């Protein structure tokens, strides 16, 4: 029998699901021992649906927050997210695939942990270590990091 090389997978440290769990985000961040300053990545729709509420929960919990509204998951939007991630301790990707992929990739590029808050169950990449970013008009699957936590209300 031939020995095959071992494979490993990095998984989220915490997965929290259920009604009302968004209110628990400050406690989740404390349990994960993440420092205070955050950047939330969302689009205009998810900002209205849950983003403003998440920002309020986090700021009330002692986490100063910045936000960035994105239009798509392109290299240009990734650069926008990364330019706002200076002096940030964690990223939050809130929404469907595009905001989560941008937060995931920015976290990988800048070595910043990110929390995934999916708002659509139809997106399957909310816990993966790959990000789909549009480059030169084509989607490209890029190596990234999985979220430190997934929080799904």
Specify the residue positions occupied by each region the protein language model found.
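A glycine/threonine-rich phosphate-anchoring loop and its flanking beta-alpha core
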Residues: 13, 108-153
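Short glycine-/acidic-enriched loop or helix-start segments at secondary-structure transitions
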Residues: 50-52, 102-104, 126-127
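Residue-level detector of flexible, active-site-proximal loop/helix-junction positions
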Residues: 72-74, 98, 121
């Amino acid at each position: 029998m031939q020995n095959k090389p071992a494979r490993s997978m990095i998984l989220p440290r915490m997965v929290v699901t259920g009604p009302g769990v968004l209110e628990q985000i400050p406690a989740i961040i404390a349990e994960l021992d993440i420092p205070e300053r955050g950047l939330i990545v969302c689009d205009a729709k998810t900002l209205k649906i849950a983003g403003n509420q998440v920002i309020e929960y986090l700021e009330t919990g002692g986490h100063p927050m910045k936000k960035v509204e994105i239009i798509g998951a392109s290299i240009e939007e990734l650069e926008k997210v990364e330019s706002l991630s200076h002096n940030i301790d964690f990223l939050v990707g809130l929404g469907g695939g595009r905001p989560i992929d941008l937060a995931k990739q920015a976290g990988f590029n800048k070595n910043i942990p990110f929390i995934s808050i999916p708002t659509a169950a139809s997106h399957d990449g909310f816990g993966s270590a790959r990000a789909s970013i549009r480059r030169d008009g084509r989607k490209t699957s890029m190596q990234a990091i999985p979220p430190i936590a997934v929080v799904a209300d």
